[in-house]
């Protein structure tokens, strides 16, 4: 308890932590908790099982409680908040609605970005709902720019989504990431006129007074939304003229300057630099903290941690809510209506509730993105940006929005790019470092070579069902085609998985498959061996965990595996990410992961807490044709076996290349064993029992000491010499002075 209290954690949380037998904070907790309590944005990386959830949950719970306590006691905060409302009383570019490298002059009209690699944009302080309007932009240098109109929902990167319309210096018009030729190029000293006819739904532009014609027709889905003047720059400078000064090229045909627009046509920006809701106004559906997880299992796990940490917090009590798919929305809405302080959820259902206004983000103080690399790899970057844009950057009590990003791979390009966009000078806490395999993990590769192992020919039809990638191909023995070898690999992998279980008498293991259909097929094959979900204690008892299983089934399957009711958990990478399963003695990789970092994540699940573990990877020596769905339904009902480059949903998977990349990443050569999967015992005293703790006595410590002994002796001699010299120097000065 004292260890956590020394970091500033309140006694009520420290007491709950102590009851969980957390005597000391983990490294990631010791580094991150004080930083978050201090009000900073934090990027953290640590291994699964390192206490990462506690590292962000504990300070988030404490600050949410303190905020609610201040509100309860009527405290307004120590800082007087400067309002940005005065900015909205005139037409100018909005300092509260711009990119991080976008500068605005004191007049609010001269704009500049000197970032040469990235685009940075800005919107105006006011928008329009009706009428015919016009403004001018003058180019001050030869940098790149796009100017035009966008709604409040649009990205600041003008023209890259369906809510903005841009015209660029390269002579292209842009909308929804579609760049088409329009008008002509423009550069320094040119003046671009931006026309908006909301009544007709038309957008057009002019160059130095020359009408370039119709550029866009405004789609129906945004006709009732206000459109704001907008631009995006890359190493460029512009100056806007909304009509306060005389236009260089006055508009015709009834278009009027923005500054002359009637008040009933105008909508002010929502971005004012303040929280959108006053401190005293209570909104039951407006949480103080939002934690986003990539999977429902991880969300449930995090919510359980939050419940444990807040156990002794009272007056006011904290109210938490889990928002995930597969649960009746009306139940979640009922809890929201009664008030909620902390929300933990997955992107799909969160997006639904936010977009319909059921979940209000106007009072969010904390935004936590757990397993951010997983969220980005699943394609949720747009959702994250949209959500972040709706959260006020400064709360009504003068506190800044805190963003916490947790990722297994902080140094990935996507995570870096995200952090630069949504975080404010974040502190990096990277305790993971370079990927490496723990000493408690023995990992080996089993080559799956259909050319030397002809078992697949002899099995006939008594083999695992394959994924139907080759349903239309000739894969009979003797075809000698890539398709035949690929099908043979799929059959052999099923046999090798069974062989590995029998050879090592596995009593518990996680088995990773590449796709959901592979998981289903392996589960079915284990059922043919007499096992399956309902065969408790059987050698091949197993359950499946992947996105196509119903939520209650996934939860039930995970619990059954944890309790030991079944021996094997067959799952995909996405489903297993971050799940709190400790000390599993075995892992089988039926297929190597697409990303080399995931190899370390997989095998890192064995051998925890000083328990030895064995990870076996089945690696095909020939290329295997596998599913790679790019279709809109993400594989459901898809039978398009053509290659991706031919418009299909398959690719050739080269596991030998992937193995090479993994070995280069880990800077080691992974041992290979024969197809009989007999693993040589060469650890410690030659007696290794996987799943058991290392034998006491130091293992190979003696050999380590023998190697270091000469160096230690040399250091001891140097230490003795240094101390002797110091003692002599104590008398030497007096002797020197006597001489003179």
UniProtKB/Swiss-Prot annotation:
Post-translational modification summary for this protein: Phosphorylated by ATM kinase; phosphorylation is increased in response to ionizing radiation (IR).
Sites where the protein binds ATP: 46-53
Alphabetized UniProt keyword annotations: Acetylation, Activator, Antiviral defense, ATP-binding, Cytoplasm, DNA-binding, Exonuclease, Helicase, Hydrolase, Immunity, Innate immunity, Isopeptide bond, Mitochondrion, mRNA processing, Nuclease, Nucleotide-binding, Nucleus, Phosphoprotein, RNA-binding, Transcription, Transcription regulation, tRNA processing, Ubl conjugation
Main localization category: nucleus
Disulfide bonds: none
Domain Helicase C-terminal: 493-681
Protein name listed in UniProt: ATP-dependent RNA helicase DDX1
Protein species of origin: Mus musculus
Lineage: Eukaryota, Metazoa, Chordata, Craniata, Vertebrata
Gene behind this protein: Ddx1
């Amino acid at each position: 308890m004292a260890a956590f209290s020394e970091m500033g954690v309140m006694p009520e949380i420290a007491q709950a932590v102590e009851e969980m037998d957390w005597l000391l904070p983990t490294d990631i907790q010791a580094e991150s908790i004080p930083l978050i309590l201090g009000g900073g944005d934090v990027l953290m990386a640590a291994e699964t099982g390192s206490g990462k959830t506690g590292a962000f949950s504990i300070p988030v719970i404490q600050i949410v409680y303190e905020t609610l306590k201040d509100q309860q006691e009527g405290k307004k905060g120590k800082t007087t908040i400067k309002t940005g409302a005065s900015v909205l009383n005139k037409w100018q570019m909005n300092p509260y609605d711009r990119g991080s490298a976008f500068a605005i002059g004191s007049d609010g009209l001269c704009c500049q970005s000197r970032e040469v690699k990235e685009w940075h944009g800005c919107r105006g302080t006011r928008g329009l709902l009706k009428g015919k309007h016009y403004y001018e932009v003058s180019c001050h240098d030869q940098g790149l720019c796009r100017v035009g109109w966008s709604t409040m929902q649009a990205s600041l990167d003008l023209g890259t989504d369906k809510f903005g319309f841009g015209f660029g210096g390269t002579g292209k018009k842009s909308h929804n990431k579609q760049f088409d030729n329009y008008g002509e190029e423009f550069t320094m000293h040119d003046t671009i006129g931006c026309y908006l006819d909301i009544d007709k739904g038309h957008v057009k532009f002019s160059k130095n007074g020359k009408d370039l014609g119709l550029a866009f027709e405004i789609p129906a889905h945004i006709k009732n939304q206000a459109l704001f003047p907008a631009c995006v720059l890359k190493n460029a400078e512009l100056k806007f003229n909304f009509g306060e000064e005389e236009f260089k090229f006055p508009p015709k045909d009834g278009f009027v300057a923005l500054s002359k627009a009637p008040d009933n046509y105008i909508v002010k920006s929502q971005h004012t630099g303040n929280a959108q809701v006053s401190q005293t106004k209570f909104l039951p559906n407006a949480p103080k903290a939002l934690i986003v997880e990539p999977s429902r299992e991880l969300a449930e796990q995090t919510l359980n941690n939050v419940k444990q940490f807040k156990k002794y917090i009272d007056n006011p009590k904290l109210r938490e809510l889990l928002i995930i798919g597969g649960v009746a929305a009306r139940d979640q809405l009922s809890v929201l209506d009664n008030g909620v302080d902390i929300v933990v959820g997955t992107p799909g259902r969160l997006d639904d509730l936010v977009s319909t206004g059921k979940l209000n983000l106007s009072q969010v103080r904390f935004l936590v993105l757990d397993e951010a690399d997983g969220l980005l790899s699943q394609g949720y970057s747009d959702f994250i940006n949209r959500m972040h844009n709706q959260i006020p950057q400064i709360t009504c009590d003068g506190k800044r929005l805190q963003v916490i990003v947790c990722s297994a791979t902080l140094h990935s390009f996507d995570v870096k790019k995200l952090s630069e966009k949504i975080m404010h000078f974040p502190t990096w806490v990277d305790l993971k470092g370079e990927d490496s395999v723990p000493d408690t993990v023995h990992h080996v590769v089993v080559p799956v070579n259909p050319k030397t192992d002809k078992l697949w020919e002899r099995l006939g039809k008594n083999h695992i069902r394959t994924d139907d990638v080759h349903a239309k191909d000739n894969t009979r023995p003797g075809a000698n085609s890539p398709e035949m070898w690929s099908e043979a690999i799929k059959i052999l992998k099923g046999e090798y998985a069974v062989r590995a279980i029998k050879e090592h008498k596995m009593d518990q293991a996680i088995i990773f498959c590449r796709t959901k259909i592979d998981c289903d097929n392996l589960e079915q094959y284990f059922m043919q061996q007499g096992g399956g979900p309902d065969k408790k204690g059987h050698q091949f008892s197993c359950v499946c965990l992947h996105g196509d299983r119903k939520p209650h089934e996934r939860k039930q399957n995970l619990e059954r595996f944890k309790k030991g009711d079944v021996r094997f958990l067959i799952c995909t990478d996405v489903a297993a990410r971050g799940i709190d399963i400790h000390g599993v003695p075995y892992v089988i990789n039926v297929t190597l992961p697409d990303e080399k970092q995931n190899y370390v994540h997989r095998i890192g699940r064995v051998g925890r807490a000083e328990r030895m573990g064995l990870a076996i990877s089945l690696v095909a020596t020939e290329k295997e044709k596998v599913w790679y769905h790019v279709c809109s339904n993400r594989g459901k009902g898809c039978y398009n076996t053509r290659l991706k480059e031919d418009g299909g949903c398959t690719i050739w998977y080269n596991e030998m290349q992937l193995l090479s990349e993994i070995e280069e990443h880990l800077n080691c050569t992974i041992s290979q064993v024969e197809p009989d999967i007999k693993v040589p015992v060469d650890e410690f005293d030659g007696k290794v029992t996987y799943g058991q703790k290392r034998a006491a006595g130091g293992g190979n410590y003696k050999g380590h000491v023998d190697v270091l002994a000469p160096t230690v002796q040399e250091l001891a001699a140097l230490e003795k010499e240094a101390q002797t010299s110091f003692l002599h120097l104590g008398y030497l000065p007096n002797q020197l002075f006597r001489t003179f």
